[in-house]
Amino acid sequence: MDFLEALSRPPLVLGVDPRPTLHGPEPLAHIRRYTLELLEALAPRLAAAKFQLAFFEALGPEGTALLWELASASRVMGLPVIFDGKRGDIGSTAEAYARAYLEAFPGSALTVNPYLGLDALKPFFQAASRTGGGVFVLAKTSNPGSGFLQDLLVEGKPLYLHLAEALEREGERYREGPWSRVGMVVGATYPEAVARVRERAPHAPLLLPGVGAQGGRPLKGEGLLFAASRALYYPGGRPDLKAALEAAEALLKALVE
């Protein structure tokens, strides 16, 4: 499996953010069963499954084991995996993070934090290149306070656009065909930012969180992956397989028509 294959699939990404309080007296068992059923039902309609690492880490060792089980099951279903951990560190620590996710699961992707600089990102880029994976660098995130740093004007241009231009240059060496293995996270809640990043980084896959519960609206364009977590995993605020299928169909219709 090569992660870039996700870009030829339907553009919807299922965000898996399990909350044990919504899963009854045996939450781990119910999370496992519900997620496997949901993945199997939605797989043909998805580009990838995105696992938010914090929600599994919060469940302790059993949660980490469940993460690996669900990620492995996704791959067996032919569904690419995104590990949403926003990792970032220097040197050997970045290399260790890359081994933990990109090399342990070849063909998968990882979200990373650029605050430490491009040199701290290169171990992730190199691991993705070796393993057929991908990297999504935080650029313009979907949260309301993202502008505190990301919108700071530097030489008349917001910081996130400086980052986008630098990543497009760096990503050229990791490009295969029309797409680079170096992508970016840009919130669907900021459609103007999506357009500005795409203009400056035409070869970068863009992971767009915020569709659904956060109010981000569907956008058109190639190389866009729209992540929906609460709207798909917990439609109506609770586990509901039938409602999740209906929500996926509605989102896909809005995305592709």
Swiss-Prot record:
A GO biological-process term: 'de novo' UMP biosynthetic process
Enzyme class: lyase
Pathway: Pyrimidine metabolism; UMP biosynthesis via de novo pathway; UMP from orotate: step 2/2
Example of a GO MF term: orotidine-5'-phosphate decarboxylase activity
SUPFAM superfamilies according to UniProt: Ribulose-phoshate binding barrel
Family (UniProt): Belongs to the OMP decarboxylase family. Type 2 subfamily.
Protein name per Swiss-Prot or TrEMBL: Orotidine 5'-phosphate decarboxylase
Lineage, top ranks: Bacteria, Thermotogati, Deinococcota, Deinococci, Thermales
Gene: pyrF
